[in-house]
From Swiss-Prot:
Family: Belongs to the phycobiliprotein family.
Domain of life: Eukaryota
Binding site for phycourobilin: C50, C61
Gene name per UniProt: cpeB
Organism: Rhodella violacea
Stated name of the protein: B-phycoerythrin beta chain
Binding site for (2R,3E)-phycoerythrobilin 1: C82
Modification(s) after translation: Contains two covalently linked phycoerythrobilin chromophores and one covalently linked phycourobilin chromophore.
Physiological role: Light-harvesting photosynthetic bile pigment-protein from the phycobiliprotein complex.
Amino acid sequence: MLDAFSRVVVNSDTKAAYVGGSDLQALKKFIADGNKRLDSVNAIVSNASCVVSDAVSGMICENPGLITPGGNCYTNRRMAACLRDGEIIIRYVSYALLSGDPSVLEDRCLNGLKETYIALGVPTNSNARAVDIMKASVVALINNTATLRKMPTPSGDCSALAAEAGSYFDRVNSALS
């Protein structure tokens, strides 16, 4: 896992060059947007349970067969596993947003995710839909357009951070397809 700083150092070191130019400007921007980034992550983690439960509820509303006998959310154990998986995904998205680097998400969450779901017989299309709903909720939280939220959200223009968070959810969906 690399954060924004480590990534720049590693890239410069492989080129046997000093940190400078566009890498330095990117780090300056990362630092300048630090409070917005922290506020965005705080908004995500403070609302994570609601975001995940809303996403799973939305997925089930669109596919009621998931909660009928034989469905992948039928029985409390399977529903709990579904909610747990959503919590894990959103947690790793928040880690990636905090560090400004998707490697923690890729390495610790997405690596082998599709194969695991296939082996367990979990429909990836339903998971992808839940991820889309989580993405929409998180982007709304970061952009301060969400309603009925638990706490204040980041102030100022956070569209770049919202897009970054959205890209991490897109990575999750790519890993599932």
